[in-house]
From Swiss-Prot:
Membrane-spanning intervals of the chain: none
InterPro entries: CBS_dom, CBS_dom_sf, DHH_sf, NT_sf, PolA_pol_head_dom, tRNA_nt/polyA_polymerase
Deletion phenotype: Essential, it cannot be deleted.
Keyword Repeat: yes
Protein name: A-adding tRNA nucleotidyltransferase
Catalyzed chemical reaction(s): a tRNA with a 3' CC end + ATP = a tRNA with a 3' CCA end + diphosphate
Residue runs in coiled coils: none
Ligand binding (Mg(2+)): D540, D542
Source species of the chain: Synechocystis sp. (strain ATCC 27184 / PCC 6803 / Kazusa)
Domain CBS: 335-394, 398-453
Residues binding ATP: 517-520, 628-629, 633, 673-682, 686, 724
Entry annotated with the keyword Methyltransferase: no
C-alpha cells in the first residue's frame, strides 16, 4: 500500500498536492493525519468520494510500502502517522514541498523542494509531463491549493510556474464557481472591525430553502473594499444571497447644493450604498437595482443613493429579492425510492455484499416494523472488517442518531444539512415512514444540473432517480417537445405504436420510457442531419416500464407486451421471464415493415464474478439506466404522464454526444462483460466518435488483467457471454466500417478477448485485404458470410486445436468449424495437387488447377488464397475468374444422341472432355465430336 500523508490541519494546498500525487501513483491512498482546515472540511463533506481517502485508523502498517509527504518536512506534524516513517519494511519516503527554509527532521529518499508559490504547483507540473487528465473536481481542488497559498496569485512568493500550473488546471476543467466558494485570500486590516460588526448584526433567514442575509453598517466616511467584505460574509455565514448596506456622512465634502438641500430639510450629506451578492439560481440583482440607478451583474451588483431612507430602500430590495427566488427542488423530486434496507441482525459481511452488489455507499437499517433504527456507511463496514468483525451484526456499528429529512425539504436545505453534519445520505421520512433516501451523489448531480442549465449547456443533468427533475429540451433538441421530434422522425405507424404502448402503461399506473439507442439516434438525426445518418432507421426500439415492482412474477414489461399483442395480433411475442423482458417482432408488416420492440421491466443487474451472466431483479428507471454500458446509451424519454416528452439523462450522455465521445458508466464494466469492449469500438467507429480517455484506460486495464483468458480457460465458459461476443463480432465484421473497428480493436489489444496470443500482425492485415478484394469480385451479392471469412483469417493465425476450440465456443456453423480446423490439411492437399508430376511445377495445366480446386467450397478456397503466396493466389484467381466459367458444348444428352450408352463411363468421358476444353484443345462443337471419335470411339455396328 502506498500512502500520501497530509499534515495536521490540512489546507487546500496539501489536499490539492495529495490528490495530484494520487493520480501519479494509481492505487495510492490519501491520509489526513490530523484534521483539516474548516473550509477543507466543508469541501470534503460534499466531495469526499471523489478522492482515494482512507482513515488513519483503517491503515494496516504492515502493508505500507511507500510514503509520500506533501507540504511538510517535519514528523511531528504527521501525528500518529509519524510512527510509519521508521517501519523496517518501508521501501521509500518522498517529500514534495515549496518551503525551502522549513525545519526538517524526516529522513527521506526523495526530496523535491522548489521555490514556487504552492506545493500543488510541483505536482501539477509532473501531471503535465505525464499527460494525465483530471476530472472537474480534481482540477478544482488543485486550483484551490494554488489560489489559497498564493492569495489568488497576489502574494509575493507567487511565480510564473504557479500561473502556468493554474492555467493548465483551468484547461482541465477547474470550476471557477467552486474555487470562488472555497478560496480565502484574506482581509485587509481596515475592514476587520467592520467585518466583526457585520457578523454580529447580520440578519439571516431561510426563504424557500435558501439563506438570505442582510446587514446595515454605518461609518463616518466612505470605506473602500466593502465588496470584498460582502463576498467574505456570503461565504462564511453560509448565506445564499446577501445585501450589505452602507450609510456614511459625506462630511467635509459637502457641496453648496448639498447645504442648500439640507436647509430645506432634505438629508443630502448622508450617502447610502448597497452591495448585493447572490448564488441563488434564477435571481438577478441587476434587475433589482437598475430601478434605483444601480448596475452590475446578475450575481453581483451595487447602487449608490442619496436623499433616501436606507432602511426603507433595503427592505424594498430585500422583499423583491425574496420574490425572485425560484421554487426549489424538493427531496421528493429526486430521492431514490424504494430504499434498500437491512435488518439490525444482518452481519457486517452480509451488509458488505449488499453494498458491493448494488453499488451503494451506505445502507439504512430498519426493524421488523419497518421503522428506521440506524444507518451504516461503507466506511463503517470497512473499519469493522479491518478489525475482523465480519460476523458481527450491524447494530453494533450503525449510527443510531440518524439525521432525516421530509419529502418537502428543499435542495438547498439538504445541502446545508449534509455539510453541517458531514453526512453522506439522508433518509426521507413521511410520518415516520421511510419513503426514500437522498445521497451526497444525488445532491451533487442536482447542483451540477442547475449549473449547467444556468450556463446554457444541455444534457448532463447527473440526477439521482426516477424522480429527478428531467432535462427540458433546448436548442440542441429543438424548442419543441421531444414527443414532437419523435413524431417527426419516426414512421407514422411506429409513432402510433408508442402512443398505444404509453396509453396501455398509463392505464395500469406505470411509467413508460423510450430508452437507449433510439434516443441517441434521435439526437444524431436532429442535430447532425438525417443525410449524415441515413443508416438510422428506428427499426429496433427499446422500451422500459417502471412498474414500481408490480407483477413481480411476470414483470410489468411482459404484461405490457402481452397487452400490446392484443392490439397488434400480427406481432410475434417472445418472452424471457428470467430477465423480465419481452419482444414484439413484425416481419414485413404493411405498416410497421420489419420492426423489433423490446419491452423490459425496469431492473438492476449484478455480476457475481467477472464474465458471468448477470443476476437480475426489478428496480427503478434510474437503476435500469445505470446498468447500461455507455452514457450515450443511458438516455430515456418519458412517454407517459406526468411530463411526457421529458428527457432523463442521469449520467451526462448528452454531454458526451455533443463531445462525440464514448464514455463507460462503470469502472468494472469491461471486466464484467468483455463484449462491451467490442460495443465501445463499434460505437466509436460507426458514429465517428472517440473513446473517452478514462474509458480507454479501463479497457486496457481489463485486457491486461487476464480476466478474459481465465474465463476462456474455464471448463464451462458462460454460454450467454459467448453468444454476445459472437453477435458483436458479427456486427462489426459485417459492417462497412469493419476496417476501422478492427484497427481500433488491434490497437487496444482487444483481440485477446478471443485468445491471449491473437494479434493483428502486418501479415494478417495483408491477408484480410486480399480477402476483401476476392469478396468484392467473386461474391458481390454476398451469398457467403463475409464476417465469418474475416474472422477465419484472424483465427487462422492460431494453432488448429486452439482455432477449433474458439470456433466451437462461438458456436459457429459446423462447416465453418471443419473448414477452419482442417485449413492446413486443405492447403497441403492443394499445394500437392498443383505441383503433381502430371504438370510442370511452375505452371500446371488449367485442367490440373480446376480438378485440384473444384471439390473445395468457396469459404475454404478464399481463406487458402488469402493466406497463400502470390502464385497460389494467381492460380485460385484464375480458377474463379475463368476456369469456373468453362463448360463443354456437349452434354450427357448429346452423348446419348451420338450413340453412347449411359453408364459409369459417361462421367469419365465428360471429365476428360472438360479437361481438354480447359486446356484450350477444343473450341467448338465439331472439335469436341472429333475429339470423342478419337479418344472414345464407338464400337462398329455389326
Amino acid at each position: 500500500m502506498d500512502l500520501i500523508l497530509c499534515h495536521q490541519t490540512a489546507d487546500f494546498d496539501v489536499l490539492g498536492a495529495a490528490v495530484g500525487l494520487a493520480k501519479l501513483h494509481p492505487g495510492s491512498r490519501i491520509v489526513l493525519t490530523g484534521g483539516s482546515h474548516p473550509t477543507v472540511r466543508q469541501f470534503l463533506a460534499l466531495h469526499r468520494n471523489e478522492f482515494p481517502l482512507i482513515e488513519l485508523r483503517s491503515v494496516n502498517p504492515d502493508k505500507i510500502r511507500s510514503l509520500y509527504i506533501v507540504d511538510n518536512q517535519q514528523g511531528d506534524r504527521l501525528g500518529k502517522a509519524a510512527d510509519w516513517l521508521t517501519l523496517p519494511h518501508l521501501r521509500q519516503v518522498a517529500i514534495y514541498d515549496h518551503h525551502l527554509n522549513s525545519p526538517r527532521d524526516i529522513e527521506a529518499d526523495i526530496w523535491e523542494l522548489e521555490a514556487v508559490g504552492a506545493s500543488t504547483t510541483l505536482i501539477v507540473e509532473k501531471l503535465q509531463r505525464a499527460d494525465i487528465s483530471l476530472s472537474m473536481v480534481e482540477a478544482s481542488v488543485m486550483a484551490l491549493g494554488i489560489h489559497v497559498d498564493t492569495g489568488s496569485l497576489t502574494f509575493t512568493q507567487t511565480t510564473v510556474r504557479d500561473v502556468k500550473a493554474l492555467a493548465w488546471l483551468m484547461e482541465q476543467g477547474a470550476n471557477l464557481r467552486l474555487i470562488a466558494e472555497y478560496a480565502d485570500p484574506g482581509f485587509p486590516p481596515p475592514l476587520q472591525f467592520l467585518f466583526a460588526e457585520a457578523m454580529q448584526n447580520l440578519h439571516k433567514e431561510m426563504v424557500r430553502g435558501y439563506w438570505l442575509g442582510s446587514v446595515l453598517l454605518t461609518t463616518e466616511n466612505f470605506v473602500p473594499g466593502l465588496s470584498h467584505l460582502t463576498e467574505r460574509l456570503l461565504s462564511l455565514t453560509e448565506c445564499d444571497a446577501l445585501l450589505l448596506g452602507h450609510v456614511y456622512d459625506k462630511g467635509k465634502d459637502k457641496t453648496k447644493n448639498d447645504e442648500q438641500r439640507e436647509k430645506t430639510g432634505v438629508i443630502s450629506n448622508q450617502r447610502f450604498s448597497l452591495i448585493g451578492r447572490t448564488r441563488i439560481p434564477d435571481t438577478d440583482l441587476t434587475q433589482l437595482l437598475e430601478p434605483y440607478g444601480g448596475g452590475g451583474h446578475a450575481q453581483a451588483a451595487a447602487v449608490n443613493l442619496r436623499d433616501v431612507e436606507p432602511t426603507t430602500v433595503m427592505a424594498e430590495i430585500y422583499q423583491a429579492l425574496q420574490r425572485q427566488i425560484p421554487k426549489p427542488l424538493l427531496a421528493r423530486d429526486f430521492m431514490s425510492s424504494p430504499v434498500r434496507t437491512i435488518r439490525p441482525h444482518t452481519t457486517i459481511e452480509q451488509a458488505q455484499r449488499v453494498l458491493f452488489r448494488y453499488g451503494h455507499s451506505g445502507l439504512t437499517v430498519v426493524n421488523q416494523e419497518e421503522k428506521l433504527v440506524g444507518i451504516i456507511s461503507r466506511r463503517d463496514l470497512d473499519l469493522a472488517l479491518h478489525h475482523g468483525f465480519s460476523h458481527a451484526p450491524v447494530k453494533g456499528y450503525m449510527t443510531r442518531n440518524v439525521k432525516t429529512i421530509a419529502p418537502d425539504t428543499p435542495l438547498p436545505r439538504i445541502e446545508a444539512i449534509m455539510v453541517a453534519d458531514d453526512v453522506g445520505r439522508l433518509p426521507v421520512m413521511d410520518q415516520e415512514k421511510l419513503v426514500g433516501i437522498v445521497t451526497r451523489t444525488d445532491v451533487l448531480r442536482q447542483l451540477l444540473q442547475d449549473k449547467q442549465e444556468q450556463s446554457g449547456r444541455f444534457g448532463a443533468p447527473r440526477s439521482g432517480s426516477l424522480r429527478d427533475r428531467p432535462t427540458t429540451p433546448n436548442q440542441n433538441f429543438g424548442q419543441g417537445s421531444l414527443l414532437q421530434l419523435l413524431k417527426t422522425h419516426l414512421p407514422p405507424a411506429t409513432w402510433q405504436l408508442l402512443t398505444t404502448a404509453a396509453q396501455q402503461a398509463q392505464t395500469r399506473g406505470w411509467h413508460l420510457y423510450l430508452v437507449g439507442g433510439a434516443v441517441r439516434d434521435l439526437w444524431l438525426r436532429h442535430s447532425q442531419g438525417a443525410e449524415k445518418h441515413q443508416n438510422i432507421t428506428f427499426q429496433d426500439i427499446d422500451l422500459v416500464v417502471d412498474g414500481f415492482h408490480a407483477t413481480a412474477d411476470v414483470g410489468a414489461g411482459v404484461e405490457l407486451a402481452q397487452a400490446l399483442q392484443g392490439d397488434y395480433p400480427g406481432a410475434r411475442l417472445s418472452v424471457h421471464g428470467e430477465f423480465q423482458t419481452a419482444a414484439l417482432l413484425w416481419h414485413k408488416d404493411p405498416q410497421l415493415d420489419t420492426l423489433w420492440v423490446d419491452i423490459a421491466t425496469a431492473r438492476t443487474e449484478f455480476y457475481p464474478y467477472p464474465a458471468a451472466n448477470p443476476e437480475v431483479e426489478a428496480s427503478s428507471i434510474r437503476q435500469d439506466l445505470y446498468r447500461r454500458d455507455f452514457t450515450i446509451n443511458a438516455l430515456s424519454i418519458r412517454l407517459t404522464n406526468p411530463n411526457p416528452g421529458k428527457l432523463l439523462d442521469f449520467f451526462g450522455g448528452m454531454n458526451d454526444l455533443q463531445s462525440q465521445q464514448v464514455r463507460v458508466l462503470h469502472a468494472n464494466s469491461f471486466i464484467e462483460d468483455p463484449t462491451r469492449i467490442y460495443r465501445a469500438v463499434r460505437f466509436v467507429v460507426r458514429l465517428g466518435f472517440e473513446l473517452e480517455p478514462q474509458t480507454e484506460t479501463y479497457i486496457r486495464y481489463a485486457i491486461a488483467s487476464g480476466v478474459y483468458e481465465r474465463w476462456r480457460l474455464t471448463e464451462h465458459p458462460t454460454p450467454a457471454l459467448t453468444t454476445r461476443l459472437k453477435a458483436e463480432l458479427s456486427i462489426i465484421l459485417k459492417a462497412p466500417y469493419w476496417k476501422g473497428a478492427l484497427t481500433l480493436l488491434a490497437d487496444l489489444d482487444a483481440l485477446k478477448c478471443l485468445h491471449a496470443e491473437l494479434k493483428l500482425t502486418e501479415q494478417l492485415w495483408w491477408q484480410v485485404r486480399y480477402l476483401s478484394r476476392w469478396l468484392r469480385w467473386f461474391d458481390p451479392e454476398r451469398n457467403l458470410e463475409h464476417w465469418l471469412l474475416r474472422l477465419g483469417i484472424l483465427l487462422g493465425a492460431l494453432p488448429p486445436q486452439e482455432r477449433e476450440k474458439i470456433a466451437a465456443g462461438l458456436q459457429l456453423p459446423k462447416a465453418t468449424i471443419d473448414g477452419l480446423t482442417n485449413l492446413e490439411t486443405i492447403e497441403t492437399a492443394i499445394a500437392k495437387g498443383l505441383n503433381s508430376p502430371a504438370s510442370p511445377k511452375s505452371s500446371p495445366k488449367s485442367s490440373v488447377i480446376y480438378q485440384t480446386l473444384k471439390d473445395y467450397d468457396r469459404f475454404s478456397l478464399f481463406l487458402v488464397a488469402a493466406r497463400g503466396n502470390k502464385l497460389l493466389r494467381k492460380q485460385i484467381w484464375f480458377y474463379f475468374s475463368q476456369l469456373c466459367q468453362v463448360s463443354p458444348f456437349l452434354t450427357g444428352h448429346d452423348l446419348k444422341a451420338l450413340g453412347y450408352k449411359p453408364g459409369p463411363q459417361f462421367k469419365q468421358i465428360l471429365t476428360d472432355l472438360l479437361n481438354a476444353c480447359l486446356d484450350g484443345e477444343l473450341g467448338d462443337r465439331q472439335q469436341e465430336e472429333a475429339w470423342l471419335r478419337t479418344h472414345y470411339p464407338l464400337p462398329n455396328k455389326v
